[in-house]
Amino acid sequence: MKKLILIGCLMAGMNINVAWANASQNLQERLGKVNSFHASFTQTVTSDDGATIQEGEGQLWVKRPNLFNWHMTSPDESVLVSDGKTLWFYNPFVEQVTANWLKDATGNTPFMLITRNDAKEWSQYKISQQGNDFELTPNNVTGNLKRFSITVTTDGTIQKFSAIEQDGQKSAYQLKGQQNTHVDAAKFSFTLPKGVTLDDQRQ
């Protein structure tokens, strides 16, 4: 009897692992159907008790695997651009630009995961699927990310994604009007504006 129970437990574990593997493969395949796109987005940040901390909106351009332009237009403007090698963050309010090597950028943020769609990075998460909804839990619980969810249709259209941090703060993004089309290369180049300070972390 004990042997049967043990076998049953092992089989259940195998089924869970297969489900995680299938969900991960499905998510990667869906995201892989779209190489480049443009969309507008809204952002809502809430505390662990559900209180709204910040609301914002902006525009997003992506060309996988390493090119993107994330332009937050409100409540405060900020620009995050990857040209494939350097990650540029521009804050017009403080007139400062920070430059980092893209290869050094963390892969455990939802946006970087979506943009890169790298199998090695996805393997660091347990992934479950319900229809178009995917939920990801990091294998490494020591990080700041507690849970990440994304809704992506079978044709690769991202409808929304959100991240919950260990302290319960949630950042939710709703994408609207995604256009799966060619994006001009100029969107992924960054020219240092006159009069701003450059904090170059690539040294």
Swiss-Prot record:
Q: Name one GO cellular component term.
A: outer membrane-bounded periplasmic space
Name the InterPro entries for this protein.
LolA/LolB/LppX (IPR029046), OM_lipoprot_carrier_LolA-like (IPR004564), OM_lipoprot_carrier_LolA_Pbac (IPR018323)
Write down the Pfam families for this protein, in alphabetical order. LolA
Q: Which Gene3D superfamilies match?
A: Lipoprotein localisation LolA/LolB/LppX
Protein keywords: Chaperone, Periplasm, Protein transport, Signal, Transport
> Would you indicate the residue range of the signal peptide?
1-21
- Chief location bin: periplasm
Where is it located?
Periplasm
For the keyword Chaperone, the answer is yes
Q: Its Gene Ontology biological processes?
A: lipoprotein localization to outer membrane; lipoprotein transport
Q: Which family does the entry's similarity section mention?
A: Belongs to the LolA family.
Its annotated function is as follows:
Participates in the translocation of lipoproteins from the inner membrane to the outer membrane. Only forms a complex with a lipoprotein if the residue after the N-terminal Cys is not an aspartate (The Asp acts as a targeting signal to indicate that the lipoprotein should stay in the inner membrane).
How does it associate, per the subunit comment? Monomer.
Protein name as it appears in the record: Outer-membrane lipoprotein carrier protein
Organism of derivation: Photorhabdus laumondii subsp. laumondii (strain DSM 15139 / CIP 105565 / TT01) (Photorhabdus luminescens subsp. laumondii)
Q: What is the lineage of its organism?
A: Bacteria, Pseudomonadati, Pseudomonadota, Gammaproteobacteria, Enterobacterales
The gene from which this protein is expressed is lolA
